[in-house]
Amino acid sequence: MQMENKKFDWSHTVSAPENYPMRIYRGELKGLTDKDYSATFGLWGVANEGWGRISGAVVVGPDTKAIPDSLLITWLSFRENKFYTGKFQLPREKIIALFEQGFYDYSIEKKNTYKKIVVGLAPGGVVVVWLLGGQVEIEVARFQAHETIISNVNVRDSNYDMFEEDYVDFVLTNKGIEKTPVPFGLWDTYREKYAWRPKLILPSGYDFFLEWMTLYNGEKENNFKEHPDFGTYKKRALPSYMLFNWYAPDDRKYGVDVFFDEKEIFDAFQQ
């Protein structure tokens, strides 16, 4: 089967940084041809679960679908009270290759693959696309949208409430979000990569077997002892969270959660 005709089981969803809510006005993951499935972003509501974290998901259309060719999106950034828009060509061959390659999912002890295409929206018109499956999430693209003004809104429009007076203030107040300065550029800083590895030092007889990491750029890794990247240096974004698991000599399993201070870890690596 030719690459452009290959189909996979996937759904689509949205992500936005915590305290920086976004809402899509119009959006579509457009198929390569008119015959291919195109996934639309309809009445999604406000997203701000955290960078890389998903805001629901839409499971519609056929069970398997061709990978989309492009992303068309227009959205409202509440903290800026601005609309952004853009049309972007997706790295389709790269996405297909990752879907085919998949990964070993330790949580189910077998090979798994990606199930969601996640579109991330951040202040300043930042657009990031990830693939998510199981406990693994990987960035595949970063785009730049531009500001736009939406006029001639029809009261019958399903998103008409976005244009009502005081709507932006209502959402920010309802979510308890203060109007502090927006740190433009932060989400590109999160994407900077450094060569590092996680390492857990244990006494003799203890067996370290699993590490699970959430990175500041929204990616997630799930490495186990037999994984080729386990314990090796690799260029990756900095971690916000890690989970380590190990066995004691009595075969009891232990684990520890590690939460990193953002300022401290970035200062340490940027020095």
Predicted features, each with a name:
Residues M1-L43, T64-K65, S70, R191-Y216:
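Sec-type signal peptide cleavage vicinity
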Residues E4, D63, F78, E109, ...:
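Generic marker of residues within folded, mature protein domains
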Residues T13-P17, Y25, K30, L76, ...:
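A structural detector for beta-sheet-dominated domains
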Residues K30-S77, F208-D267:
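Tryptophan-paired
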Residues R79-F83:
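Short, exposed coil/turn segments at beta-strand boundaries within extracellular/luminal domains
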Residues Y84-E109, T113, V118, G255-Q270:
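Short beta-strand elements
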Residues L98-W187, Q271:
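Compositionally biased low-complexity segments at domain edges in trafficked proteins
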Residues K175-T189, P198-G205, G231-K234:
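Long, compositionally biased intrinsically disordered regions
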